Amino acid sequence: SGETSGEGNGMWFGPRL
């Protein structure tokens, strides 16, 4: 659930914003 890979971040900004 994220534009890139923000599944572990909780929102949409993942580890590779």
From Swiss-Prot:
What organism is the protein native to?
Diploptera punctata
- Give the UniProt subcellular location, in the record's own words: Secreted
Tissues in which the UniProt entry reports expression: Expressed in abdominal perisympathetic organs and abdominal ganglia.
Q: Which GO terms describe its cellular component?
A: extracellular region
Keywords, ordered alphabetically: Amidation, Neuropeptide, Secreted
Q: Name one GO molecular function term.
A: neuropeptide hormone activity
GO BP, one annotated term: neuropeptide signaling pathway
Which protein, by its recorded name, is this?
Pyrokinin-5
Q: What does this protein do?
A: Myoactive.
- UniProt record similarity statement: Belongs to the pyrokinin family.
Residues with the Leucine amide modification: L17
UniProt keyword annotation of Secreted present? yes
PROSITE patterns given for it?
PYROKININ
Q: Quote the InterPro entries the UniProt record gives.
A: Pyrokinin_CS
